[in-house]
Amino acid sequence: METTTYKISDIGEVVGGGTPSTANSDFWGGDIPWISPKDLTGYKSVYISHGESFLNKTGLKSGTKLLPKDTVLFSSRAPIGYVAIASNPICTNQGFKSIICNKEIINPLFLYYYIKGNLDYIKLFGTGATFPEISGAAMRKIKVQIPSLPTQQKIASILSAYDRLIENNTRRIRLLEQMAENIYKEWFAYHKIKGQSTAIKLKEIVSITRGLSYSSEEIDCTDGNNLINLKNIQGYGGFRLDGTKLYNGKYKPEQIVEEGDLIMGVTDMTQDRRIVGSVALIPNVNTLSVISADLVKINSSIDNTYLYAMFRYGNVSRHIAQFANGANVLHLKPTSILNIKVILPNQKIIDSFVSKVKPMIHLINRLNSEIDSLTRQRDLLLPRLMSGKLEVKS
């Protein structure tokens, strides 16, 4: 594949961002999307339209820039390497060095994949011992190997076909999760189950098994059992297949988890409390799996599908998260949750709920498995296409 060497400054304009004063409410609450690297944490889609925050015109003028549609957004610090494409005009904070593409030279979608495929190289341009950062000047000087526009478009088309399938499955999962949440909230509003439920402490229906501690040597392996860990818990609940590690150390039988088991995060690496207290159901992973010490397994005679919904959709997890403490890393003492009171419906209602929601959980797991497979296929293709080892006809 023939390529031309450019500096990034040759193929687009590198633009930083800014943060209007958060102390001034007059700057915020408009309709102009403003994102920070936090909005891209765990973000899987190629395109992004907005994050959690919005500016008004006064806020825009006070300290940031409006980037046009199709700008390639690149987080240049805390951390380096989040990438997305603006699907509409958008602002960023100072944690970005974004690229407004010269479309006569570079296809924005191709550049998105090029950056994804060359992150290790690009990260070398970061400076700073504690929090490495790529400066605007350094970003502009980074050299890239770019093929012709028709070849760029073909490569982008191949890779984006995988991402469209991934995003379609992701949308279906969101709909299924919303349906499950709606059913839970409709069925278990207190006034609807009054007289058919009992107030109990969690310790009356659950016991807790702590996961195992491990050394770096025990996960520095290419063969072993699955180690389900904190990265397998999605923010506010749900299971992530891509967080699994391999582990070749010892474990106790009670630390094994199987399909349908319920786990909870008892640590959080940030103060956001998105993970601590959150729960997930183990899908079918076809390999012996054990849990790490930052998780617990929740054991109960009550169906785990109901308990999962109770923790996640009944706000029990959010309540539990408030018991976690720590200056930098949050820790939750597992036994501290056992005295929390919950409302338990009678068995007939639980069984009826489970019969409706369990098939949704199974479908969510299947769609997540498809996403994992598509992601691995795309990630195998990406370096081969970018290097020219896999030739495409333009």
What are these regions (language model features)?
Residues 36-38, 51-116, 229, 253-316, ...:
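A short beta-sheet element
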Residues 103, 119, 123-126, 166, ...:
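Structural signal for hydrophobic packing residues in well-ordered secondary-structure cores
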Residues 1-18, 141-213, 343, 347-389, ...:
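Non-catalytic DNA-recognition/assembly elements of restriction-modification systems
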Residues 21-29, 127-128, 198, 215-223, ...:
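Short coil/turn segments at secondary-structure boundaries
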Residues 76, 90-98, 128-156, 287-294, ...:
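A short glycine-rich beta-alpha junction/loop motif
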